[in-house]
């Protein structure tokens, strides 16, 4: 499925979810208000979602003078990937992580945390940056930032549903299909989960491709594999202050590794990603299935490299 179609499907699904919440909160009038709100959010998501996410994490832009080493790495990678130079931001958090955002490669942004720069070596930083530039190259960034903005709006509406339940609902008794307090409570629980499932469906498959493309850009799969190991370890030791609606845009999920979060994880298992980078398989074993998956991974990486030229 092309990313244009994926974006359209995402916007339609998120809009439908908002309308359901609006209908539960205020009947037909609530549904129409939600539709208008969704239209505004769709417009804002396309033009301003990157700014919203950067503001959310208090990211600051760097220049070649203020962070020469980081700027030089990105500059080298974009030349290899045949991409325009993105704007680069640093997030004031100690947990190592990164994300890319923007509506297209000409308006792309790459953001890294202070922890990434402090805790990873140059090869690992290069691997992470190559992974994020792969998302830019594969045009994943628009759909990712739109999903983040829309999921945030849905979670806000779900919170309104929860308050509506607390105060006994907001609809009059003569509206068709009057919603109950129990319905509002259920909606306040289900809506955020539905938003996470949509995020998961959008982003999970793209992470493997970004890993393969990133390895092709950097020319060093081990750099990214080692970085993923460290990011996974440090994310547990130094929890990140992250909004769940933006979890899918990061290199690794910044959310706590609880069973529920793993169930609704927006990323594939780290072990699987690392094994694919190192061995071309999910297990790293030398059996026939592993050999087949290794050939598939090599084919995927070669295709990614062909797209760079």
From Swiss-Prot:
Please give the cofactor(s) recorded in the UniProt entry for this protein. Answer: Zn(2+)
- Enzyme Commission number(s) from the entry: 3.4.24.-
Please tell me where Zn(2+) binds in this chain.
131, 135, 207
Q: Which residues form the active site?
A: 132
- The main location class comes to membrane
GO MF annotations for this entry?
A: metalloendopeptidase activity; zinc ion binding
The record's region (Disordered) falls at: 278-309
What does the UniProt cofactor note say? Binds 1 zinc ion per subunit.
Annotated GO biological processes are: proteolysis
A GO-annotated cellular component:
plasma membrane
Membrane topology type, per the record? Answer: Multi-pass membrane protein
Q: Into which EC class is this enzyme placed?
A: hydrolase
Question: Carries keyword Membrane?
Answer: yes
The transmembrane residues are 7-27, 29-49, 141-161, 182-202
Q: Where in the cell is it found?
A: Cell inner membrane
UniProt keywords (A-Z) are:
Cell inner membrane, Cell membrane, Hydrolase, Membrane, Metal-binding, Metalloprotease, Protease, Transmembrane, Transmembrane helix, Zinc
Return the similarity comment: Belongs to the peptidase M48B family.
Q: Which NCBIfam families does the protein's record reference?
A: PRK03001.1 (NF002826)
**HAMAP family under this entry?**
Pept_M48_protease_HtpX
Supply the name of the protein. Protease HtpX homolog
């Amino acid at each position: 499925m092309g990313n244009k179609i994926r974006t359209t499907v995402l916007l339609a699904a998120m809009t439908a979810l908002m309308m359901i919440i609006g209908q539960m909160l205020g009947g037909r009038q609530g549904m129409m208000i939600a539709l208008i709100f969704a239209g505004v959010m769709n417009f804002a998501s396309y033009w301003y979602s990157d700014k919203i996410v950067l503001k959310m994490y208090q990211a600051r832009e760097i220049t070649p003078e203020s962070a020469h080493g980081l700027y030089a790495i990105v500059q080298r990678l974009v030349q290899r990937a045949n991409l325009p130079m993105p704007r680069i931001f640093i997030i004031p958090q100690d947990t190592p992580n990164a994300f890319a955002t923007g509506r297209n490669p000409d308006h792309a942004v790459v953001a890294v945390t202070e922890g990434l720069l402090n805790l990873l070596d140059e090869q690992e930083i290069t691997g992470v940056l190559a992974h994020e530039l792969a998302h830019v190259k594969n045009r994943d960034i628009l759909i990712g930032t739109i999903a983040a903005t829309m999921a945030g709006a849905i979670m806000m509406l779900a919170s309104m549903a929860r308050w509506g339940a607390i105060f006994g609902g907001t609809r009059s008794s003569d509206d068709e299909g009057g919603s109950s307090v129990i319905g509002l409570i259920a909606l306040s629980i289900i809506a955020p989960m539905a938003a996470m499932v949509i995020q998961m469906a959008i982003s999970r498959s793209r992470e493997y491709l970004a890993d393969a493309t990133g390895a092709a850009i950097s020319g060093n799969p081990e750099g990214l594999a080692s970085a993923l190991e460290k990011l996974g370890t440090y994310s547990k030791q130094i929890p990140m202050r992250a909004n769940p609606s933006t979890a899918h845009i990061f290199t690794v999920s910044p959310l706590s590794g609880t069973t529920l979060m793993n169930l609704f994880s927006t990323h594939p298992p780290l072990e699987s990603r690392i094994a694919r980078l190192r061995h071309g398989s999910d297990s790293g074993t030398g059996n026939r299935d592993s050999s087949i998956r290794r050939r598939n991974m090599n084919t995927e990486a070669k295709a990614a490299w062909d797209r760079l030229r």
